């Protein structure tokens, strides 16, 4: 056994041993309970970050713990390998994205292996492999055949820098999620998936408690994104005719509202820039035409429109109020989306905050029609009660006056239905998923374009449509347009004439919508999913239905995008008879972000320059609060001592120079320290604030563990010296008489084991580590018994240390593996890989004696030890005979016993 804890040597040896044993290859086993635990697959950006380390260590701890408890556990890994970053790196470095991606995968895989993760690498996949994306294409064709996939022209979000379409979810405050460029609106053809057909079911599963293992926060985010609204769709009649003489829209401008009770407060209508009425008015209005062009920049999402300045322009057109026949002016508003509802909204300035601001800006009448008792309406400023539908009562609304919200909505709906101008309707915020991307590095959409037959699906026998690997994008659009090899020899499947391939590729969220199923049978070239998927993804107690994977782990940032698409994809596969589950993930854990200090200073260009924490010294006030920082060495043009700004804690990122390189951490302290620190510092769901001093503390703890094992080894106290049961509890034909210290040690160890086991089941891994630390403290503090019972001491120590090693093994597997073997536990009960989880010994928890506080006249004067089952009379006798009682020099008048707590002698 090594005299010194050397993590690099220990970890290398342990990993070599696991590799030689092929320790983590998993197959189906009908004799064991199965458990499928999976982390969200990473994008191969080049290097792991500490968020990866935390995510995968959580998964690894769960996997190892369950394996020790007799489960057949699958922990796979793959690569979300398509996407824009690879293209941009190719532009920067002048190399094909395929090469850049493969090199990154190779390096990041080495990093994962250095962490000692229990990954079954035989199931590794990369979404850029033709053998994987063939099935993207195959399922796309099935969706096309079933009408789930379709092609249409629509106004989309266009990123002018990346020159691609963005899904609504990829637009943040009117800017592209990756480039930050102001998003434009364009009309282009593309393929869409009817996720809206599944809206009701997608909503039901997150609102009807059918996903009890999901965080409530995530379910609420999905509920809000799906956005079911029940309201009224009705029309404002008009007589505006187009160039052909026909009434535009049949002479009706339709809107949808959930606030029909405010219909008498409508003072204008607004339409989207793409609305037919706007287009008609712009033909004779150059200013309006210019405004419509201006509206084409900016996002097409509700979030984007909510943050941008609200602008509008009169069209000169009018519609008629359906109840009062009052003429209402039509405006073009940059905040109205053509893709939502009918591309028009009714303007009720008095009771809608957006309309209120718009009316103030353009001098439009504000007409109050709802009153809340005790409130005063001020036409100059918005107050939250203006939109209160719970307390409000209608006023200034003719026959509808005096009605509460629901009553007024029903009454208005009835009248408009009678007039043939309205109907009750349910609408959804969710929109069909646009999957076409005008980029190269993605799954080719399996469509051929023929001059005669249009868009024709590629025959299944010709799949996969393979993406050329030799393209080097130059940033000026999709290189597939001009790639001769991609189009060479392509003919129409219908007529056989020369044709061209579709050059759009699929949104990369398609790749990640089902990869977890492919892990179950990754090498199958005959089917998308097969028997292995049924084994790993389904509860064997359920014939059909239910949820799939047992545990999914990933960041909260994927709550809407990835998770919603994966749920949709699973339901489509179910309806096509490919899987038997309703949902992809039974339980979901969203781990917290890893945070670090952020230091910056504004540069001469007006931007901010960020500094690495190791180059900075913090400045504190008298209370110890960080109030600033200064450089401890020259950085670029900034000399040592320069004052810089402290921005607080924030997510680790390359752009802010506050990341920690896992490889450097492993090189200095070892993988076990990195794993231990990320688990101990905070609960898995909470943010982890990085602290270099705490890393040192984690490393010191592991040195203590090693040194204690070294002491046992030197004293000859190895597991081979005692007969151990498989669970780690002592088991001999004639159990030795444990001395009091040994009994106390065993009681404390088994109490801690009970708590640690409970925390493992709850996945509260920070308290698992703290429990293990308490175990080590108990072992280190153990004092030998009297000579007559010293024979039992080695057994208590070796049992206790064996329990500690097994409690530590899921979080720090390398050091536990090494000590387990060096101290003979492997020879006694088998290799730690498959050693059983230690069981709590109920006998060890039984206390022979208990300690009671001793009071004299209500004041604490010490304690006494009494038999655990002592009667009150026996306790009184022991208390009266205690040194403190005898020192009083008198006979107590009364003895008060509080069972299990204290004895009070009253003199």
UniProtKB/Swiss-Prot annotation:
<feature type="short sequence motif" description="'HIGH' region">
    <location>
        <begin position="42"/>
        <end position="52"/>
    </location>
</feature>
<dbReference type="InterPro" id="IPR002302">
    <property type="entry name" value="Leu-tRNA-ligase"/>
</dbReference>
<dbReference type="Pfam" id="PF09334">
    <property type="entry name" value="tRNA-synt_1g"/>
</dbReference>
<dbReference type="InterPro" id="IPR013155">
    <property type="entry name" value="M/V/L/I-tRNA-synth_anticd-bd"/>
</dbReference>
<keyword id="KW-0547">Nucleotide-binding</keyword>
<protein>
    <recommendedName>
        <fullName>Leucine--tRNA ligase</fullName>
        <ecNumber>6.1.1.4</ecNumber>
    </recommendedName>
</protein>
<keyword id="KW-0030">Aminoacyl-tRNA synthetase</keyword>
<dbReference type="InterPro" id="IPR014729">
    <property type="entry name" value="Rossmann-like_a/b/a_fold"/>
</dbReference>
<comment type="similarity">
    <text>Belongs to the class-I aminoacyl-tRNA synthetase family.</text>
</comment>
<dbReference type="GO" id="GO:0005829">
    <property type="term" value="C:cytosol"/>
</dbReference>
<dbReference type="InterPro" id="IPR025709">
    <property type="entry name" value="Leu_tRNA-synth_edit"/>
</dbReference>
<dbReference type="Pfam" id="PF13603">
    <property type="entry name" value="tRNA-synt_1_2"/>
</dbReference>
<dbReference type="Pfam" id="PF08264">
    <property type="entry name" value="Anticodon_1"/>
</dbReference>
<keyword id="KW-0436">Ligase</keyword>
<dbReference type="GO" id="GO:0006429">
    <property type="term" value="P:leucyl-tRNA aminoacylation"/>
</dbReference>
<dbReference type="InterPro" id="IPR015413">
    <property type="entry name" value="Methionyl/Leucyl_tRNA_Synth"/>
</dbReference>
<dbReference type="InterPro" id="IPR001412">
    <property type="entry name" value="aa-tRNA-synth_I_CS"/>
</dbReference>
<keyword id="KW-0648">Protein biosynthesis</keyword>
<dbReference type="GO" id="GO:0004823">
    <property type="term" value="F:leucine-tRNA ligase activity"/>
</dbReference>
<dbReference type="GO" id="GO:0002161">
    <property type="term" value="F:aminoacyl-tRNA deacylase activity"/>
</dbReference>
<dbReference type="GO" id="GO:0005524">
    <property type="term" value="F:ATP binding"/>
</dbReference>
<keyword id="KW-0963">Cytoplasm</keyword>
<keyword id="KW-0067">ATP-binding</keyword>
<dbReference type="InterPro" id="IPR009008">
    <property type="entry name" value="Val/Leu/Ile-tRNA-synth_edit"/>
</dbReference>
<feature type="binding site">
    <location>
        <position position="654"/>
    </location>
    <ligand>
        <name>ATP</name>
    </ligand>
</feature>
<dbReference type="InterPro" id="IPR009080">
    <property type="entry name" value="tRNAsynth_Ia_anticodon-bd"/>
</dbReference>
<feature type="short sequence motif" description="'KMSKS' region">
    <location>
        <begin position="651"/>
        <end position="655"/>
    </location>
</feature>
């Amino acid at each position: 056994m090594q005299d010194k804890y050397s993590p690099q040597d220990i970890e290398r040896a342990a990993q070599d041993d696991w590799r030689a044993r092929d320790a983590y290859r998993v197959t189906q086993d009908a004799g064991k309970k199965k458990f499928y635990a999976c982390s969200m697959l990473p994008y191969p950006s080049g290097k792991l970050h500490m968020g990866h380390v935390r995510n995968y260590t959580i998964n690894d701890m769960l996997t190892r713990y369950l394996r020790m408890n007799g489960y057949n556990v699958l922990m796979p890994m793959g690569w979300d390998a398509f996407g824009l970053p690879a293209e941009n790196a190719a532009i920067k470095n002048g190399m094909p994205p395929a090469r850049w991606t493969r090199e990154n995968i190779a390096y990041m895989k080495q990093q994962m292996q250095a962490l000692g993760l229990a990954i079954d690498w035989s199931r590794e996949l990369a979404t850029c492999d033709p053998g994987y994306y063939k099935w993207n294409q195959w399922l796309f064709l099935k969706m096309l055949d079933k009408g789930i996939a379709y092609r249409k022209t629509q106004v989309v979000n266009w990123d002018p820098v990346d020159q691609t379409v963005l899904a609504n979810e990829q637009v943040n405050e009117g800017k592209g999620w990756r480039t930050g460029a102001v998003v434009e609106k364009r009309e282009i053809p593309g393929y869409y998936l009817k996720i809206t057909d599944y809206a009701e079911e997608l909503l039901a599963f997150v609102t009807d408690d059918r996903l009890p293992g999901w965080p409530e926060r995530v379910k609420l985010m999905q509920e809000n994104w799906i956005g079911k609204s029940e309201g009224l769709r009705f029309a404002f009649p008009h007589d505006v005719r187009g160039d052909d003489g026909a009434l535009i829209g049949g002479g009706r401008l339709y809107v949808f509202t959930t606030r029909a009770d405010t219909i008498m407060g409508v003072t204008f209508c607004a339409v989207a820039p793409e609305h037919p009425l706007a287009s008609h008015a712009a033909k004779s209005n150059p200013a309006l035409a210019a405004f419509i062009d201006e509206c084409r920049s900016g996002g097409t999402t509700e979030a984007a429109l909510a943050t941008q300045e609200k602008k509008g322009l009169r069209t000169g057109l009018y519609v008629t109020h359906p109840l009062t026949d009052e003429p209402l002016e039509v405006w073009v508003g940059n905040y109205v989306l053509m893709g939502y509802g009918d591309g028009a909204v009714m303007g009720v300035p008095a009771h809608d905050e957006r309309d209120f601001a718009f009316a103030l800006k353009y001098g439009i009448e504000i007409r109050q029609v709802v009153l809340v008792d005790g409130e005063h309406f001020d036409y100059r400023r918005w107050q939250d009660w203006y939109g209160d539908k719970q307390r409000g009562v209608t006023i200034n609304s003719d026959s509808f006056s005096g009605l509460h919200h629901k009553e007024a909505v029903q009454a208005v709906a009835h009248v408009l239905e009678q007039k043939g101008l309205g109907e009750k309707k349910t609408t959804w915020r969710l929109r069909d998923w646009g999957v076409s991307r005008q980029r190269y590095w993605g799954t080719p959409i399996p469509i051929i374009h023929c001059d005669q037959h249009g868009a024709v699906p590629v025959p299944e026998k010709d799949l996969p449509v393979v993406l050329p690997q030799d393209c080097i994008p130059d940033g000026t659009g999709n290189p597939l347009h001009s790639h001769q090899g991609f189009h060479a020899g392509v003919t129409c499947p219908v007529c056989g004439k020369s044709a061209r391939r579709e050059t759009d590729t699929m949104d990369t969220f398609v790749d990640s919508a089902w990869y977890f199923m492919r892990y179950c049978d990754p090498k199958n070239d005959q089917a998308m999913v097969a028997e292995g998927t049924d084994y790993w993804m389904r509860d064997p107690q359920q014939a059909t239905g239910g949820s799939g994977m047992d545990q999914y782990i990933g960041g909260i940032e994927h709550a809407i995008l990835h998770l919603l698409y994966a749920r949709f994809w699973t339901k489509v596969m179910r309806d096509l008879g490919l899987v038997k589950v309703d949902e992809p993930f039974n339980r979901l854990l969203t781990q917290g972000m890893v945070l670090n200090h952020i230091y910056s200073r504004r540069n001469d260009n007006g931007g901010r320059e960020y500094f690495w924490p190791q180059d900075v010294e913090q400045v504190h006030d008298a209370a110890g609060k960080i109030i600033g920082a200064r450089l401890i060495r020259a950085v670029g043009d900034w000399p040592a001592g320069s004052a810089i700004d402290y921005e607080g804690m924030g997510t680790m990122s390359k752009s802010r120079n506050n990341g920690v390189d896992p490889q450097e951490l492993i090189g200095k302290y070892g993988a076990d320290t990195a794993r231990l620190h990320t688990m101990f510092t905070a609960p898995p769901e909470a943010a982890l604030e990085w602290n270099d001093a705490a890393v040192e503390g984690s490393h010191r703890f592991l040195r203590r563990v090693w040194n204690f094992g070294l002491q046992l080894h030197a004293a000859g106290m190895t597991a081979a010296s005692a007969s151990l049961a498989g669970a780690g509890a002592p088991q001999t034909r004639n159990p030795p008489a444990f001395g009091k210290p040994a009994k106390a040690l065993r009681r404390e160890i088994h109490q801690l084991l009970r708590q640690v086991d409970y925390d493992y089941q709850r996945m509260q891994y920070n308290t698992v580590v703290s429990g293990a630390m308490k175990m080590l403290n108990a072992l280190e503090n153990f004092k030998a018994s009297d000579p007559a019972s010293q024979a039992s001491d080695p057994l208590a120590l070796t049992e206790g240390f064996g329990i500690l090693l097994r409690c530590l093994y899921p979080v720090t597997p390398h050091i536990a593996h090494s000590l387990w073997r060096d101290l003979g536990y492997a020879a006694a009960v088998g290799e730690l890989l498959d050693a059983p989880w230690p069981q709590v010994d109920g006998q060890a928890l039984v206390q022979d004696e208990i300690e009671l506080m001793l009071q004299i006249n209500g004041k604490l004067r010490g304690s006494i030890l009494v038999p655990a089952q002592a009667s009150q009379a026996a306790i009184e006798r022991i208390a009266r005979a205690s040194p403190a009682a005898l020192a009083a020099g008198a006979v107590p008048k009364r003895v008060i016993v509080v069972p299990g707590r204290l004895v009070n002698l009253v003199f």
